[in-house]
UniProtKB/Swiss-Prot annotation:
The keyword Glycoprotein does not apply. GO terms for biological process: cholesterol metabolic process; fatty acid metabolic process. Coiled coil: none annotated. Keywords: ATP-binding, Cholesterol metabolism, Ligase, Lipid metabolism, Nucleotide-binding, Steroid metabolism, Sterol metabolism. ATP binds at T185, S186, G187, T188, T189, G190, R191, S192, K193, D398, R413, K504. It is an enzyme of class 6 (ligase). Disruption phenotype: Cells lacking this gene completely degrade cholesterol to half the yield of wild-type and accumulate HIP. Gene3D superfamilies: 3.30.300.30, N-terminal domain of ligase-like. Disulfide bonds: none annotated. InterPro entries: AMP-bd_C, AMP-bd_C_sf, AMP-binding_CS, AMP-dep_synth/lig_dom, ANL_N_sf. It comes from the Bacteria. It holds the Pfam family AMP-binding. The lineage of its organism: Bacteria, Bacillati, Actinomycetota, Actinomycetes, Mycobacteriales. This is 3-[(3aS,4S,7aS)-7a-methyl-1,5-dioxo-octahydro-1H-inden-4-yl]propanoyl:CoA ligase.
Amino acid sequence: MTEQPTTTPSALKRAAREFGELTAVADGDVRLTFTQLHDRVRDFAAALSSQDVRPGDHVAVWSPNTYHWVVAALGIHYAGATLVPINTRYTATEALDILERTKTTALVVAGNFLGTDRYASLRDESSTFDLPTVVRVPVDGGDAELPGVFDFDDFLALADEDTRAEADARAAAVSPDDVSDVMFTSGTTGRSKGVMSAHRQSVGIAQAWGECAEVTSDDNYLIINPFFHTFGYKAGFLVCLLNGATVVPMAVFDVPKVMATVHDEQITVLPGAPTIFQSILDHPDRPKYDLSSLRVAITGAAAVPVALVERMQSELSFDAVLTAYGQTEAVVVTMCRTDDDPVTVSTTSGRAIPGMEVRIGDQGEILVRGENVMLGYLDDPESTAKTIDADGWLHTGDVGTLDDRGYVDITDRLKDMYISGGFNVYPAEVENALARLDGVAESAVIGVPDERMGEVGRAYVVAKPGVTLAEDDVVAFCKERLANFKVPRSVRFVDSLPRNPSGKVMKNVLREEKK
């Protein structure tokens, strides 16, 4: 293979050259080879040029996982513009805030999807909302024609010989240090921040991920993680672009559909939160599907019990189960390798990927430094300076340990720690104990006010199907395994835990409900 590319346009050109007739994207009935993907991306970039979108402009995508997202994102880059992904769970108010803050000049937006017309919601939210270029993605169908709004295929048809030549010139001019995207943090506390990354970083992350997971052109890569999140984008379809693997996007998570897709598409790589794999393992229809093609799983965002790793390997035929750690500000920091044993995978988040350093700072905070640390927050130098110190160390806000091998164990978030009777309590320690209680599918622990202790723990517990647990059972189990100040004083049984798109539990939501 030729020298590694450092921009997504150069990665696309290399993929078309080296993997040409292999399948790049398999989205239902739509099958695109790498050559066809290149041509559609080029046409999308040419169409942007025809609409006066300039290099450096911000272009947003607010749409679920379909092949259109891949074409649009790479087309935005090919045109020299900056991609702004928008969370499909966002309300029109939240989306408008991002569009305004980024001064977006064009928007790619889903039509009717899960009962919502996102473009209509934007117009309803603001009577002054107006963008010069809006491209609508057909998802559920039945979209009425709207003046000034291009349907996706009609937009591609705007490309002509002159605009394609302009697009090629812009793609060739993209620099490794140009901003490739502005990814907004989940905003679980306060206002979300726009994280800026360079092309070399986005491509470098995908390269490291692909190397650790040993992704090749023989792989079929099911992407359930949203494209608007780094897990679906930089650790998703960009990995496939670099390695010639096939992207199989899934717009809505559904366990039977996941199993059917693994069966039909011979999926080999399946990234996702631990709950995805637990749901597959526990589903009564699992024996109906042939899941033997599965080769590697990459997970994280929550504790991964050793028993789950072992079941994934013995019952789902995974040759390797990997965990990884990162955040929007440094997408992939550490990652396990395919030869790591189940205990290492379960108890750590791997070791630093090439180009990254990790050390433990004050209060056990994990600090990271290296090539893939963000350029900074959009229009927010003050927050950037607070997050990245003068020596270039990114302060993650995560608490953890580093063993002699360089493997990281993420124990908690600094902000999730609470103080009970003068003692620091890290909820993840309690949650790890609860994971060993028979009948517990998952749990989340927060601190709640207490007159005598200051704060005490409250556990939110999701029981496994068909299992009945009592509060006394949970408390008694913890008392046998934890110091008294760590034992939850109350337990709430819930059907599910609130999660952000990366699969992390949104404890701020639980705190709002604590009364």
